[in-house]
Amino acid sequence: MLLGLGHVDLVCSDVERSIAFYEHVLGPLGLGNAAVFEGERGESIHYLRFPRPGSGSIGLRQAFEEQEFHLYAPGLHHVAFAVDSKADVDTAHAGAVAAGAQIIHAPRDFPQYHPNYYATFFLDPDGFRIEVATARDTR
């Protein structure tokens, strides 16, 4: 039986910058550094874990060649993080603003996705589109 998504790895142009960004933006919501593993090319993969046991992680690894990320090229479109409340969405947005991220959508309702869907969208340092959202009817 499929249980969910275990982890997603993002290849970053500057892994230390990306670690600092994600820890600054999502650290206040519980994302933390779980472990560092060696990748198949000898690179370090930094896994930032979600706070609930068994809920997965996001891996950040150093790129070996420069290549600009394109949102609509084959591959990743965006990564969405689920949070408990609208206040958590607002916290992530404030962290993204403080980190200098390009904001795509400030926190707001997206009823086309779900009646209670509330989200913010921004770009990480490599241009990956990040979404932080809740579908719970809480503040």
PLM feature spans:
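N-terminal beta-strand motif that seeds the catalytic metal site of vicinal oxygen chelate
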Residues: 1-19, 79, 136-139
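Conserved Rossmann-like nucleotide-cofactor binding loop
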Residues: 128
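Short glycine-/small-residue motifs
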Residues: 57, 131-132
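Short glycine-enriched loop/turn motifs at secondary-structure junctions
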Residues: 2-4, 72-76, 114
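Vicinal oxygen chelate
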Residues: 12-17, 79-125
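Core segments of cupin and vicinal oxygen chelate
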Residues: 9-56
